Amino acid sequence: TSKKSIPKPPSAAEMKAARKKWEASPDGIMVNKWKASPEGQKVLAGAAKIRNHISDSTNMEAVVTSLSLPPGSRLGFGVMVRINGDDYILSFGLEESNEFQQLHSLKVNDKIIIRSHFVSYAPKYSYPIVAGDYVERDSKIIYKRAPRKGGC
């Protein structure tokens, strides 16, 4: 049997150097300018407001505000929601085998309970992007993300 060499993960110093290099690239400069802009600050503040719910994967009350994502979105299936007065993209990804069937029954102004493990943002979007892991309406679960196959 041959032993494959497993590349060791980069050190903290290597990761820091790689980040500095990326920040100096055109993409890095654009992202940092966006983060400093009023629109970027608004998105980052919205993400920060729900960070504790995300890290603890606790329930968040949301209201569906739109059944479609902003024009040009490339996030798969999702809806727009309002959580504590701020708007968010609630994204579920690409649909495989009708797993989102019950989510298609959502209507504007529906009050839902959501849970997520991840919130992200990108200069292309004017709202933080919440990964939908769990959705409940009228005390009934209408979506629960299946655990990943093969671990984590």
Residue ranges and their predicted role:
Residues 58-64, 109-117:
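OB-fold and OB-like beta-barrel modules that bind single-stranded nucleic acids
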Residues 48, 63-66, 90-102:
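N-terminal post-signal-peptidase region of extra-cytosolic proteins
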Residues 74-77, 99, 128:
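Short, surface-exposed coil-to-beta transition loops
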Residues 72-93:
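OB-fold (S1/OB) nucleic-acid-binding surfaces
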Residues 1-56, 150-152:
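OB/S1-fold single-stranded nucleic-acid-binding modules
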Residues 55-75:
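Structural detector for short beta-strands of small beta-barrel domains
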Residues 97-114:
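Short nucleic-acid-contacting surface segments enriched for D/E, G, S/T with interspersed K/R
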Residues 119-151:
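OB-fold/S1-family single-stranded nucleic acid-binding modules
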